[in-house]
């Protein structure tokens, strides 16, 4: 094999992508040696070398400028995974796929509850990145410059507004319905209207009298029958239990509180009478002593 044919085979191997060391080993394995070409061979092969060298450079440049991509997905625009369909968008076949920042921002804002009003588009060149240029492509990055308000903040502001309104209403001195105290009608008004029976009059009058007595009003007027029964019970029992008070109050058409208050007043009256009786007895004793002394001093001697 002459030098021309050997150089042609070597050039074809270089074009196919073999390394120079691999080409030399391939020639050694086949037992072929590369002879030094003569001057005539060099003159004849100058044009051939220039032609193949130009083709080799063009092929290498095209291979370097072509992006590395999967042969099975060379012309495919579908996302690598079904769950990332919103993250990718179809681009030019010669450009690498770039994540869609618009879909990412919309998903993030929708999850957090933001409601953007206006968007500003800014285009940044990848040549200014620290990682270096990437095929001089441009990536669109959508940023949000509008006012950001969360729904929870709005709810919180609404709650504070309602609380402030309630405080203003309370401090203004307005009287609500639940603040008004409803009292029973007086006995005279019920008699004039004639809307209740005698029993209801006595019961309600007893309750009203309790309220009036506790607040310093008029006292209850008991009937003769009620006073007789109460005096009879007081003669045997000065202190009553709650069950006994209820038992006495029902037939007398009185309340338990009325019976309790009557017994308290009756005990105080008895103590007062005892104190007055003791004082009168002491006064009588002291008067007798004085009379006896006067009689002794005024008596004439015999």
Swiss-Prot record:
Residues 215-274 bind DNA. Residues 214-224 have a biased composition (Polar residues). Transmembrane segments: none annotated. GO terms for molecular function: DNA-binding transcription factor activity, RNA polymerase II-specific; RNA polymerase II cis-regulatory region sequence-specific DNA binding. Residues 198-224 are annotated as: Disordered. One of its GO terms (biological process) is regulation of transcription by RNA polymerase II. GO terms for cellular component: nucleus. It comes from the Eukaryota. Keywords: Developmental protein, DNA-binding, Homeobox, Nucleus, Transcription, Transcription regulation. It is found in: Nucleus. Residues 198-208 have a biased composition (Basic and acidic residues). InterPro entries: HD, HD_metazoa, Homeobox_CS, Homeodomain-like_sf, HXA1/B1/D1. Sequence-specific transcription factor which is part of a developmental regulatory system that provides cells with specific positional identities on the anterior-posterior axis. This is Homeobox protein Hox-C1a. It comes from Danio rerio (Zebrafish). The lineage of its organism: Eukaryota, Metazoa, Chordata, Craniata, Vertebrata.
